[in-house]
Curated annotation (Swiss-Prot):
GO terms for biological process: rescue of stalled ribosome. Keywords: Endonuclease, Hydrolase, Nuclease, RNA-binding, rRNA-binding. It is an enzyme of class 3 (hydrolase). NCBIfam families: PRK04946.1. Residues 98-173 form the Smr domain. Belongs to the SmrB family. Acts as a ribosome collision sensor. Detects stalled/collided disomes (pairs of ribosomes where the leading ribosome is stalled and a second ribosome has collided with it) and endonucleolytically cleaves mRNA at the 5' boundary of the stalled ribosome. Stalled/collided disomes form a new interface (primarily via the 30S subunits) that binds SmrB. Cleaved mRNA becomes available for tmRNA ligation, leading to ribosomal subunit dissociation and rescue of stalled ribosomes. GO terms for molecular function: RNA endonuclease activity; rRNA binding. Its EC number is 3.1.-.-. Gene3D superfamilies: 3.30.1370.110. HAMAP family: SmrB (MF_01042). This is Ribosome rescue factor SmrB.
Length: 183
């Protein structure tokens, strides 16, 4: 960093002489621009509504018929089984992760609903839900809840790098992105 060069006594006196008789200008024309909200910012009320809307699909009474042999897996009727195979092989990598460790069943349902809403809002196709081993309550309930949701296309037990049998990789049906129409 350069040192400031100091003025000689002669230069300082010349500066003071030239500046005598001047007055300070008052700045009174400051314009403050209003702070704009980010366009991508979603209101909290809308987030809570999306979470509630997506979590009402999860019922504890309804027991969908899932394969109990081998790895936990599910594919919706209108989805190709090849998608499930690609999910199992690790062709899809999850972009969002949800950890359900330590949550109650009600909290877990709400978080699953919020995750599905976030995936659809952010156009995320694959996500990972970590239910853990624990007392096997969430491990048993999570696949049953996911199979009930209409936007869940498929899920499969996660590979080791994403949690193994303590996690699920989930494919979410997302809406096609449409660019906004210009006026």
């Amino acid at each position: 960093m350069k040192k400031k060069t100091s003025l000689s006594e002669e230069d300082q006196s010349l500066f003071r002489q030239l500046m005598s008789g001047t007055r300070q200008i008052a700045q009174d024309t400051i314009v403050h621009r209003p702070i704009r909200k980010k366009v991508t910012e979603v209101p909290v009320k809308r987030l809570l509504q999306e979470q509630a809307d997506n979590s009402h699909y999860f019922s504890d009474e309804f027991q969908p018929l899932l394969n109990t042999q081998g790895a936990v897996k599910y594919v919706r009727e209108d989805v190709s089984h090849f998608e499930l195979k690609k999910l199992r092989r690790g062709d899809y990598s999850p972009e969002l992760f949800l950890d359900l460790h330590g949550l109650t069943q009600m909290q877990a349902k709400q978080e699953l609903g919020a995750l599905i809403a976030a995936c659809r809002r952010e156009h995320v196709f694959c996500t990972c839900v970590m239910h853990g081993h624990g007392k096997h309550i969430l491990k048993q309930q999570t696949p049953l809840w996911l199979a009930q949701h209409p936007h869940v296309m498929a899920f499969h037990q996660a590979p080791k790098e994403y949690g193994g049998d303590a996690a699920l990789l989930v494919l979410i049906e997302i809406e096609e992105w449409q660019p906004p129409e210009l006026p």
